[in-house]
Amino acid sequence: MGCLFSVNSKKVRIFDTTLRDGEQAPGIDLTVDQKIRVAKRLAELGVDVIEAGFPASSDGEFEATKKILSEIGDQVEVTGLSRSVKQDIDRTIDTGLSSIHIFIATSDIHLKYKLKMTREEVLNRIYESVRYAKDHGLIVEYSPEDATRSDEEFLLKAVKTAIDAGADRINIPDTVGVMHPFKFYDLISKIVKVTGDKIVSVHCHNDFGLATANSIAGVMAGARQVHVTVNGIGERAGNASLEEVVMSLKKLLGYDVGVRTYLLYEVSRYVAELTGVPVPYFKAIVGENAFGHEAGIHVHGVIENPMTYEPISPEEVGNFRRIALGKHSGIHGLKRLLEEQGIFLDDTQLREVLKEIKSLAEAGNKVTSADAKAIAIKVINKKITA
């Protein structure tokens, strides 16, 4: 199954920050070995950039970044986060990385309460830090933290300053998730106009549940890179979900994302297991119910042609189709489920089994395929002994 709607041959880069922004979520603390294992899975998945961590923040982060680079640095771009200060940049250089992600906030609230700096001082810091990193031969991505709450004129000035200093990419973070798609589209359109041939990236948080939608809007406005995390993990309400962004770009907009999508479910479960953060049951793409069906009309349609009630095939993302049993079930779904277990009933028997299943479900019981099989065997035996 190809693109569902329009086709666009342009490439969109996938920048995975599961190991940095994702791990910043409270309660997620991966060991160095676990971070390496996740990084290997991400490289296998085919993302373009892996943000391995924040090397200057701790000795553990420094060592993890070094080891990730040594393990997969020949397969994928590995980068590290850095504040716009010389000591952070030096620490990142010491890991052996050839790529760095430098940030400093541009919103007035951050300047006043966190940085205690003037706008002019911030612009000077941007130029000096980006230039310093470039002078050391690094690929530089610059992020104006809290960009979406920044004065627009000043934000554009900060972006231009980073470009003048030699930045290779400009990333626009919606740090506290206050954008909606229409507003973000307008902002990214303006950023793209002042960046020339530089890659514009977006980094969206999910505080209002719009991280994926905003990321897609950013790409539609001209961004050519998206920051994501596996399962959308991250601080507060999380980040844009890798699996949602990848499949939306590929199937709805026809972009080349370069990701082996058949590994999405597997990687999702792997990260969930290591972090201890479960995947929501109704999670798009990788949730247990993402391709689940119970209602009789839906199940009948899916059996005849899965596209009647599925926008993509579960196999494309490594997930599975699940036919559930309950008070909404119909005879077609039951027949398929039983036949998959080697049980073949006539219509009269099927109706009898279905009646008992619905009775159990309406009483609040969960009915499994094993339950259906047991009921079917009971119906068969009743006919034999009759």
Swiss-Prot record:
A molecular function (GO) term: metal ion binding
Q: Which cofactor does it need?
A: a divalent metal cation
State the activity regulation: Is not inhibited by leucine.
Q: What catalytic activity does the UniProt entry give for this protein?
A: 3-methyl-2-oxobutanoate + acetyl-CoA + H2O = (2S)-2-isopropylmalate + CoA + H(+)
List, alphabetically, the InterPro entries matched: 2-IPM_HCS-like (IPR050073), AIPM/Hcit_synth_CS (IPR002034), Aldolase_TIM (IPR013785), IPMS (IPR054948), LEU1_arch (IPR011830), LeuA/HCS_post-cat (IPR054691), PYR_CT (IPR000891)
Record keywords, A-Z: Acyltransferase, Amino-acid biosynthesis, Branched-chain amino acid biosynthesis, Leucine biosynthesis, Metal-binding, Transferase
Q: Which GO terms describe its biological process?
A: L-leucine biosynthetic process
Tell me, according to the record, the phenotype of the null mutant: Cells lacking this gene exhibit very retarded growth in MM and the addition of isoleucine does not affect the growth of this mutant, whereas the addition of leucine appears to improve growth in MM.
Pathway given for this chain reads: Amino-acid biosynthesis; L-leucine biosynthesis; L-leucine from 3-methyl-2-oxobutanoate: step 1/4
Domain Pyruvate carboxyltransferase stretches: 12-265
Residue positions annotated to bind a divalent metal cation are D21, H203, H205, N239
Q: What is its EC number?
A: 2.3.3.13
Pfam name, any one: HMGL-like
Q: Does the keyword Transferase apply?
A: yes
Q: How does it assemble?
A: Homodimer.
What is this protein for, i.e. what is its function? Catalyzes the condensation of the acetyl group of acetyl-CoA with 3-methyl-2-oxobutanoate (2-oxoisovalerate) to form 3-carboxy-3-hydroxy-4-methylpentanoate (2-isopropylmalate). Carries out the first step of the leucine biosynthesis pathway. Also displays a low citramalate synthase activity, using pyruvate as substrate, but is unable to use 2-oxoglutarate.
Please state which protein family the record places this protein in: Belongs to the alpha-IPM synthase/homocitrate synthase family.
- Please identify the protein, giving its name as recorded: 2-isopropylmalate synthase
